[in-house]
């Protein structure tokens, strides 16, 4: 359970991406953060400046007296900081050498190198955020679309936390009521309190079910929709990838078989991230390199959430086209009849006789009817998703798994009462549900889970 801890040492890390840029930020957090930074800083005395102020000066090696860089240094004092500890942020010029030199000086003067995610972990351990909010910090960093960011911001603001806390309080109130009955059986309130317990278990179970119904939507918004672009060679797959990405990542030529591997790219369709995979054409080949590409394409199709299957509308349906139609028959897919400007030998009616999947007729190179493709994707997966950034969504497998576990405990409460089990035994399942919900927010999460979760963060976060 999150609690305020004061015995942490002082940590330091580079918080910005390593490389050349306008500025880099080196971050400190801990009881000695200001004192350590002050050893290196020539300008104002950082130990005497007000909190939440920024100061111009130079970082100087205290041993050699060499000026390392010209900097702006922010001083942020506990408890109104991200970690609820004293923090210092050194804004230096954005270069690998100068940034690392400043970090090494901080480490040589009393700071410790931060573990991945340790700043956010301290924010959690000091009670500033819960685990769902900590996860949302990582989601904001990794957001691939505006919608991903908006959903993560809702989580960071405490949307899911508030919902979980409300459900836990309802269960806690019920448990307290039942404890009175168990401890004072002479009042003979079994029938009344058991029915109240059942009703509350049903109510909270329904709330959990409503959250679980958002899990698929939340997963897609957070992780993206794995989308395989499939078709025989030279049918327009790379042209579709280039149109959607507005980029030349995939090589487009008139020679069949030029995409010899799977190429991945993220794009935003109606605000939802699609992880596009441009696959090699699936066809018989003796070329060893192409064979590898074909096998990877089959694997990509198997793992895809959505298949965009391209057919050349200007040519008759080939044996390879038919194989691809069979290979993707059990996938969610959209059929794209491309090159319709060159003539129509494959019509919508012909494909409708084979499948009831959505069909888009287009010329990708001439960008005809491409908005229909985005609309078809939205309709297939995301109907009603437009306002989801304001919804409370379950966005990862950990949350969904724990909600499912809590719901099962509540179902056990209901069945136990129906079977007239003793209240003290039913109470165990009720407490299990309460504890499991607490794991979601971190209030009753084991240390191993907390350590594993924060290890997924980047350094400096």
UniProtKB/Swiss-Prot annotation:
Keywords attached to this entry: Cytoplasm, GTP-binding, Hydrolase, Magnesium, Metal-binding, Nucleotide-binding, Potassium, tRNA processing
Binding site for K(+): 234, 253, 255, 258
Keyword set includes ATP-binding: no
Broad class of the protein's primary localization: cytoplasm
GO biological process: tRNA methylation; tRNA wobble uridine modification
Entry-linked InterPro entries: G_TrmE, GTP-bd, GTP-bd_TrmE_N, GTPase_MnmE, MnmE_dom2, MnmE_helical, P-loop_NTPase, Small_GTP-bd
SUPFAM superfamilies, per the entry: P-loop containing nucleoside triphosphate hydrolases (SSF52540)
Keyword Zinc-finger on entry: no
Subunit relationships: Homodimer. Heterotetramer of two MnmE and two MnmG subunits.
UniProt-recorded name of the protein: tRNA modification GTPase MnmE
